[in-house]
């Protein structure tokens, strides 16, 4: 994948970018055409080694496969970068999953290192057919909705209903491969290796996450028009680092993030009523203290509402789960429910979309997207988008 020049004289049209983005989900969409192909940039590997019919790029080092690997995470930014050599991938609406293949046996791990292999036996078996003896692979699992676009709710339902055979696995990186540590190899060359591997061995459930080179603003706009979650911008020359970095940037089409569920209200204010009226939400501040962030009262089905109530009643406590043990107050910019609020142990995490934050730190026009079983409540903080020019000034903590 040859490096793209940072100065471009032609700006691709939003329509053209939508056509190219359509190829990412072409196997699932009826409106995709054969000529919708992503960039597929090939990198110069210099002196390289060959193993298992795969070219190991220059910069790789012989190394033992680690038992655990913390993933590289992206920094939220407000706009696409305007300088540097960047590639763009679809931001899939799913769960981050890393695969360790040891002695030919795959195991699936969440970003926090929990082994989910038993939850997705069909995917484990398909990974086994790749014929890899030793590797760490990085990607995202998704389930496609009826419109052919990744659906977080459909993914959650797949786990809740034990229908994980519907899951697709989009791979986008390979930090370790067949006895080599590739983390210091430039991204473009790691992805070239992964793409070559999957061109001949990909299955109907395991796919390469294609990238797009070009004007990031147009690519992002096209992704939003296609109702995708957003895009990920990655520096083509960057190494793989096990922390949140500023060589991977995420741009979201809507405001959306995880929140800790701190309580709920009953539907119509009746404790015996099925379902719930609203969820009460919180995030951790810079000091690590849990603070109130508002509520959400829409976005769930009758079935989901009943499931949420069963989970929450089992976690109920007498007092609000905040550091000062006081009930949060209504702010000027938000309204609190008139019905009694019931508090719970702050262990469940929900994905919430919303229009904006109010000046007093609460959500407006929020909608429930689903539970996040892959992220611990202690890690949930308010996401703040950086300007892209500021993203590279100093490193972020993990």
Predicted feature locations:
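Catalytic cores of nucleic-acid ligases and guanylyltransferases
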Residues: 1-398
């Amino acid at each position: 994948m040859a490096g793209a020049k940072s100065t471009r004289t032609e700006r691709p049209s939003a329509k053209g970018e939508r056509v190219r983005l359509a190829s990412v989900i072409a196997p699932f969409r009826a409106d995709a055409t054969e000529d919708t192909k992503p960039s597929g940039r090939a990198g110069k590997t210099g002196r390289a080694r060959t193993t298992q019919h795969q070219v190991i790029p220059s910069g790789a080092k012989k190394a033992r496969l680690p038992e655990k690997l913390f993933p590289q995470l992206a920094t939220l930014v407000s706009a696409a970068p305007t300088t540097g050599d960047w590639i763009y991938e679809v931001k899939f609406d799913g769960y981050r999953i890393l695969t360790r293949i040891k002695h030919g046996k795959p195991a699936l791990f969440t970003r926090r290192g929990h082994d989910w292999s038993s939850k997705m036996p069909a995917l484990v078996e398909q990974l086994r057919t790749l014929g890899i003896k030793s590797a760490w692979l990085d990607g995202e699992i998704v389930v496609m909705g009826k419109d052919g676009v990744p659906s977080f709710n459909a993914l959650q339902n797949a786990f809740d209903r034990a229908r994980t055979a519907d899951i697709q696995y989009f791979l986008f990186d390979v930090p370790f491969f067949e006895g080599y540590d590739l983390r210091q190899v430039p991204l473009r060359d790691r992805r070239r290796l992964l793409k070559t591997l999957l061109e001949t061995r990909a299955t109907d459930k395991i796919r390469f996450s294609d990238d797009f080179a070009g004007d990031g603003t147009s690519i992002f706009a096209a992704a939003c028009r296609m109702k995708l979650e957003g895009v990920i911008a990655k520096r083509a020359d960057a190494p793989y680092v096990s922390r949140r970095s500023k060589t991977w940037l995420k741009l979201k089409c809507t405001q959306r993030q995880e929140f800790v569920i701190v309580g709920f209200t009953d539907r119509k204010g009746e404790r015996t009523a099925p379902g719930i009226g609203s969820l009460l939400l919180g995030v951790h501040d810079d000091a690590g203290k849990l603070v109130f962030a508002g509520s959400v009262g829409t976005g769930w089905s009758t079935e989901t509402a009943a499931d949420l109530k069963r989970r929450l009643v089992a976690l109920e406590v007498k007092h609000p789960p905040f550091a000062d043990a006081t009930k949060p107050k209504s702010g000027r910019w938000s309204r609190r429910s008139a019905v009694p609020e019931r508090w719970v142990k702050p262990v469940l995490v929900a994905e919430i979309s919303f229009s904006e934050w109010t000046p007093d730190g609460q959500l407006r026009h929020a909608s429930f997207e689903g539970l996040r079983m892959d992220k611990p409540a202690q890690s949930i903080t308010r996401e703040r988008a950086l300007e892209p020019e500021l993203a590279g000034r100093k490193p972020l903590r993990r």
